[in-house]
């Protein structure tokens, strides 16, 4: 089997890229820099499964935990639930974090 220079070059580049990816990827247990977050940025918005219409600045079609979200002057919108996570703090700082981890096996193994 005959190898030409281009094939050898491709193999060398493949090995170099693989080596670079393995030596420069994050490793379990490595220190990751924590970014400071603004509580106003830590939010979760989820669709409530309903549409709504704003009439005279009010909407009664959304459920209790949802709000009507519309664009500009368009009276038609969607119901969304907004959760602010910023006030909850870092869960890893909670002294009871170890109690929150599963202590028993969650999934049962198939029996033969």
UniProtKB/Swiss-Prot annotation:
- From what superkingdom does this record's organism come? Eukaryota
Signal sequence span per UniProt? Answer: 1-23
Q: Which positions does UniProt annotate with glycan attachment?
A: 51
Q: Which UniProt keywords apply?
A: Disulfide bond, Glycoprotein, Secreted, Signal
Q: What's a Gene Ontology MF term here?
A: C-X-C chemokine binding
Tagged with keyword Secreted: yes
List the GO terms this entry assigns under cellular component, sorted alphabetically.
extracellular region
Location within or outside the cell? Secreted
For region Disordered, the annotated ranges are: 89-112
Disulfide-bonded cysteines: 48-66, 52-68, 62-79
Q: What does this protein do?
A: Salivary chemokine-binding protein which binds to host chemokine CXCL8.
The name this protein carries in UniProt is Evasin P1095
What is the species listed in this Swiss-Prot or TrEMBL entry? Ixodes ricinus
